[in-house]
Design a protein with these regions (language model features):
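Glycine-rich flavin
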Residues: 76-77, 87, 94-101, 106-247, ...
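Flexible metal-binding regulatory segments at protein termini and peripheral loops
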Residues: 1-81, 87
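Flexible, glycine-rich terminal cap/loop adjacent to redox cofactors
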Residues: 81-88, 92-109, 121, 125-135, ...
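Glycine-rich dinucleotide-binding loop and its adjacent helix/turn
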Residues: 120, 216-273, 277, 304-305, ...
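Short hydrophobic core segments
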Residues: 81-83, 189, 208-219, 253-254, ...
Length: 539
């Protein structure tokens, strides 16, 4: 006899409780059922059945269900082995143990993964500090003295690292300390068979970990292009750049996507001369207008931006880097390589057990995070999904639900994305070209920020909000923005996309004044009105 706890969605009244209870009671082997509409839950006592049968019965009755916990004899506890210890790994471990599983987590490097140690957290600290330094000399407000502050980069790095260590302890190490169902192993894992991992532990011992389910959550690392001379040069990746205690005289940034733009602009704001070198255009995967606007902003701040530039060779002598980019010969004292990231899947033995990967080594998963081997799941930057920590965490949680017999899909159709330049860059949904490729007959409107009252009050009208909608119905398809606080604005757009709102719906909503998010309302109104002819706050 075991007890299975289910999360139930879709119940709105007492009749719903009754319908769910009848559906569960009708499953052979069920002896007792308690359903709570208020708690969105059901407790089922049963013997000789799998949780999947209970989930299926609830779904057949017209409601949603997933397994939240399964209690039984210790021998029944599902064993989940997780390779990695970042956002995806911890989200999965927490959810799996909530469902009654025991977890073995294996990490070869630093606990916590990229985001807290080398990515999101330290980069945002650096960017914020650099923005404050830049504003002191470049703000637009009369009567307030403009001056260039003294920068003590070593002190900035020390404060940044202090936050990294505090968050690693609070959000990762303490979870392990307080969850007895998670066993942590420091070491390097490789599949010995579809059912077992061999672990070369950091203490020199070898261990075999056998499990019922496996999650690959090993993240990604900077990808370095095969440019002649680059491998022998002492270039920076994002990790070295974020930890650097000196400000370069001239920083050359190889790559024009998120990491390169964020860190490069931060050093620009701290006083470095910066040159961006991109093989294609800036942010080639985003709406083309975004790259063009960001280039104008960077050049106005004093950066040099080279696009469609093919670097033929790199050399470094006496502390100076030399880049041959055809007609352009560049020289600088530091080189940041920010040309993308590659999955950390080498050495895991995936091909030997039949786990399919793409050409870049990313694990191919379906919407339920399953790999080509049914009991092996993957989540986070090591997969073929977008490389954002919140996507990784959501994927890890859903993978755990599915490993425990539930049914949780990861829907990325309204995924918000943010790049933390100044102003910020954000998007959700389809670009205009993507909508055309899907034959959705899109139309678009672009609202420059001199039409947004908050931007006028900030004396910073750089950027725009662009909306893409289905021409026939007005259904919102995508939102793309370059704006101050665009990262805050975009979540409202993502919710509108999720709700299948039209531009007319958005244009008629109440938005607070003066806020940057009001730009969404104003942009939506441009599909039918000339917003320049409207009064402030016009509804």
């Amino acid at each position: 006899m075991s007890t299975v706890a289910l999360r139930i969605t879709g119940m709105t009244c007492g009749e719903c409780e009754r319908h769910v209870k009848e559906a569960l009671t009708g499953v052979p082997g069920v002896t007792q059922v308690e359903v709570s509409q208020r708690d969105a839950s059901a407790q089922v006592e049963a013997s000789g059945i799998e949780p999947e049968a209970l989930v299926a019965a609830v779904k057949a009755a017209g409601y949603g269900a997933s397994v939240s916990k399964r209690e039984g004899a210790p021998s029944e506890a599902l064993h989940v082995a997780i390779v990695g210890s970042g956002g995806a790994a911890f989200a999965a471990a927490i959810r799996a143990t909530e469902g009654g599983a025991r977890v073995t987590m294996i990490e070869r490097g630093t606990l916590g993964g990229t985001c807290v140690n080398l990515g999101c957290v330290p980069s945002k600290v650096m960017i914020r500090g650099a923005d404050i330094a830049h504003l002191q000399s470049a703000h637009a407000f009369e009567g307030v003295e403009r001056r260039r502050p003294a920068i003590r980069r070593a002190a900035m790095v020390a404060q940044q690292q202090g936050l990294v260590e505090a968050l690693r302890q609070a959000k990762y190490a303490s979870v392990l300390e307080n969850n007895a169902a998670i066993r942590f192993v420091q070491g390097k894992a490789r599949f010995k068979s579809p059912q077992a991992l061999g672990v070369a532990r950091s203490d020199g011992r070898e261990e075999e970990v056998r499990a019922d389910r496996f999650l690959i959550a090993t993240g990604a690392s900077p990808a370095v292009p095969p440019i002649p001379g680059l491998a022998a040069a002492p270039y920076w990746t994002s990790a070295e750049a974020l930890a650097a205690e000196e400000i370069p005289e001239h920083l050359i940034v190889l790559g024009g996507s998120a990491v390169g733009l964020e860190i490069g602009q931060a050093f620009l704001h701290l006083g470095a001369r910066v040159t961006f070198v991109e093989l294609l255009t800036l942010l080639p995967r985003m709406d083309s207008a975004i790259g063009e606007e960001v280039r104008r902003i960077l050049e106005a701040e004093g950066a040099r931006v080279l696009v469609n530039a093919h670097v033929r060779s790199v050399s470094c002598q006496d502390g100076r880097f030399a880049l041959d980019a055809g007609a352009e010969k560049l020289s600088g004292d530091r080189l940041l390589v920010a040309t993308g990231r590659r999955p950390n899947t080498d050495g895991l033995g995936l091909s030997e057990i039949g786990v399919a990967t793409d050409r870049g080594g990313a694990v191919i998963v379906d919407e339920r995070l399953r790999s080509s081997v049914p009991h092996v799941y993957a989540a986070g930057d090591c997969t073929d999904q977008p490389q954002f920590v919140y996507v990784a965490a959501a994927a890890g949680t859903r993978a755990a639900v599915n490993m425990l017999g539930g049914d949780a899909a990861l829907d990325l159709s309204a995924m918000p994305a943010v790049i933390f330049t100044t102003p910020q860059i954000a998007s959700a949904g389809l670009t205009e070209q993507e909508a055309r490729d899907r034959e959705l007959s899109p139309e678009s409107r672009t609202l420059t920020l001199d039409n947004v009252p908050r931007a006028l009050a900030n004396f910073d009208t750089r950027g725009f909000v662009k909306m893409v909608a289905e021409a026939r119905t007005g259904r919102l398809l995508g939102v793309h923005a370059v704006a101050a606080e665009a990262g805050e604005l975009i979540q409202a757009a993502a919710l509108a996309l999720r709700a299948n709102m039209t531009v007319a719906d958005l244009g008629g909503e109440l938005f607070p004044y003066l806020t940057m998010v009001e730009g969404l309302k104003l942009c939506a109104q441009t599909f039918t009105k000339d917003v320049k002819q409207l009064s402030c706050c016009a509804g």
